Amino acid sequence: MANKQITLYENLRACSYTPFYLAQTLGFFEEEGLDINLQLSPSPTETAQGLIDGRADVSFGGPMRVLMHHNTDDNCPLICFGQVVARDPFILVGQTPNPTFCFQDLIGPKIGVATDVPTPWMTLQDDLSRAGVNPNSINKSVDKTMQEHTVLFKKGELDIVQVFEPYAQELLESGGHVWHRFSTRGDIAFTTFYATRNFVNSNRFACRSLIKAINKSLNKIHQSSAAEISDAIRPFYFPYLTPNAYENIINRYKDSKLWPKTTALPVESFVRLKAALLSGGLIQKDIPYDRIVDQELSGPEGE
């Protein structure tokens, strides 16, 4: 019997998505009876809208986008399943060392905030508020991409930048210093699969196969060296990185517990993300977990 074909939208190219790339290069999807047509989404907005309009079957990205759609449409068909990136992959990089970082240190310096997608600022502003710092009090640059902020940081025009990998690695190589890893916040359901409820219900076995493949990938990541993972992925997805650079990125993310042991999607992780989006005003409705997440499908053992 031929494998089930699935068009899978990749939200954007990022090192935090390593489990997806590993599942593709090592053939885990194929082992589970899937023929994956992996397409890089033209934009983060399209990653969700393309599912609704039928241009893709499944996407991987942040539940934030699904929450935004449900916030404006009570009949939104999108649903998440499977936590693949559990923690926040973003990092604060500063021009000078700051081994005793606290959020009050962000009052004053010029900060390049990541606004390529909404979640990084939403979670940062929530962290600031919880630490007693008014998010409006910081001197932030928000009208440029992470790539542009990286260039400005190297020129000395920004004191701090909020970036994910591989931008952080690039800045560390050029003399920057890690101030803070947002992964220390704990699990926050940063990245999942999502699809329309109709697709999930009509293709339950295929969605279950996606989950099985990613659990294989997560297990492989936790059992393998950074060099082994890099060798399997880098030539295909990050050829511009040196082996040492990608290995450093993988080790930092593994040390940060960015990738969970399994795809189970706990209520607590979802609630922590939702709280940040509510506090930042990105969403106004307190949308229930069961409306957004297919919990039974998410677990490693299935239904």
Could you describe each region identified by the protein language model?
Residues 2-133, 140-143, 159-165, 179-181, ...:
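Short, glycine-/small- and polar/acidic-enriched structural segments
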Residues 24-25, 30, 129, 172, ...:
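Short polybasic/polar patches that bind polyanions
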Residues 56, 60, 154-155, 254-267, ...:
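Short amphipathic alpha-helical segments at helix boundaries and their inter-helical linkers
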Residues 108, 173, 294:
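Phosphate-coordinating loops and pocket residues in cytosolic domains that bind phosphorylated ligands
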Residues 148-238:
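Pocket-lining segment of extracytoplasmic ligand-binding domains
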Residues 202-283:
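Secondary-structure end/capping motifs
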Residues 274-303:
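Conserved C-terminal helix/tail region of periplasmic/extracytoplasmic solute-binding proteins
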